[in-house]
Amino acid sequence: MFFSFLSIYRKIDKDLFKEMEMIKAVLFDFGGVIAEEGFREGLMAVAKKKNLDEQSFFKTAEDIIYKTGYVIGKAKEKIFWEALSKETGVKDDYRRLRLEILRRFVLRTEMLSLAGKLRDAGMVVAILSDQTNWLDEINSKKPFYDRFDYVFNSYVLGKSKRDSSAFRDVAKIIGIKPHLILFVDDNSHHIKRASEAGLKTIHFTGIEDFKPQLEAVGIKIN
């Protein structure tokens, strides 16, 4: 009888510990996860029209958006476009160029649905994105903020995912320990920094692989 009771106690104790260690929040990247990667695809489309090397043009723009501080709200959008024009020689009206980016941030309905199911299951769901004022513009045209408990935009947060402390800051804001948070991103460098900050991670490669990846970290959704 004693050993039987002890076995039951140990099972309950293990189940309780397992429940305590379950993921309680999921942070999603925006471009490349919740939506198509409009920044990269838009810039590459611009480069193609200008007969420029697409990858090189995108990499230059990516470097500039961080160097100018635009992505963390330290510079206005016009500064970014002026710097890009100076570096690449592209002289078009930036208002036309930005549309090439914005129209390519197409929301992925299946990913929004999955986020909703996680939320219905009691998890905190949030966006953590290196974005700019563009994110609010996208939301104003096709609202999606209401699908999430939090939207962390580097432009507002004042830190990008290139700064590993951003992950710890977000964990404090939502009140959940890093090891109980799952971070989903298509950028391997961001994934590495999030992992080093103590978060569980999924390197997103496509919707087809995402459900099995969730199950691998203990999350099952119908």
Please state what every model-predicted region is.
Residues 1-8:
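Hydrophobic alpha-helical signal peptides and transmembrane signal-/tail-anchor segments
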Residues 101-106, 129-130, 159-160:
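Short, flexible loop segments at the rims of nucleotide/cofactor-binding pockets, characterized by
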